Amino acid sequence: MNQNLLWFEKLKFNNQDLIPAIAQDYRDGTVLMMAWMNSESIQKTLSTGEAHYWSRSRSQLWHKGATSGHIQKVKELFYDCDGDTILLKVEQIGDIACHTGARSCFFNAVPIYPQS
């Protein structure tokens, strides 16, 4: 295996051969979205420099923004200490990551009521 891909062997995919991937704005740290990746989408992301995910609903490779134009240019890729989550630091073209038209998919705030 290519020395540059030795890290890939450390990844822990679930029983569907998927791994969660968080997309984060590389400039301000905003968490934009969570999606699933498989080995094919990771390889495609690395070879193109643009985020590719695995669509569980369509069971196919998904080039983020291919239809909308809101592609994600990957600036950095990390994996966590357990090897079971990927973090993509991206430049979000068009400043829209969510299919709802929002910048981030995480716009549903839940109030926290500390217990006394």
Curated annotation (Swiss-Prot):
Keywords associated with the record: Amino-acid biosynthesis, Cytoplasm, Histidine biosynthesis, Hydrolase, Magnesium, Metal-binding, Plasmid, Zinc
One BP term from GO: L-histidine biosynthetic process
Cofactor: Mg(2+); Zn(2+)
Compartments (UniProt record): Cytoplasm
EC number from the UniProt entry: 3.5.4.19
GO molecular function per UniProt: magnesium ion binding; phosphoribosyl-AMP cyclohydrolase activity; zinc ion binding
Source domain of life: Bacteria
Cofactor binding, per record: Binds 1 Mg(2+) ion per subunit. Binds 1 zinc ion per subunit.
The keyword Zinc-finger is assigned to this record: no
Residues that, per the record, bind Zn(2+): 81, 98, 105
Catalytic activity: 1-(5-phospho-beta-D-ribosyl)-5'-AMP + H2O = 1-(5-phospho-beta-D-ribosyl)-5-[(5-phospho-beta-D-ribosylamino)methylideneamino]imidazole-4-carboxamide
Sites where the protein binds Mg(2+): 80, 82, 84
A single Gene Ontology CC term: cytoplasm
Pathway: Amino-acid biosynthesis; L-histidine biosynthesis; L-histidine from 5-phospho-alpha-D-ribose 1-diphosphate: step 3/9
Role this protein plays: Catalyzes the hydrolysis of the adenine ring of phosphoribosyl-AMP.
Assembly with partners or alone: Homodimer.
Database matches in PANTHER family: HISTIDINE BIOSYNTHESIS BIFUNCTIONAL PROTEIN (PTHR42945), HISTIDINE BIOSYNTHESIS BIFUNCTIONAL PROTEIN HIS7 (PTHR42945:SF1)
Family per similarity comment: Belongs to the PRA-CH family.
The name this protein goes by in its record: Phosphoribosyl-AMP cyclohydrolase
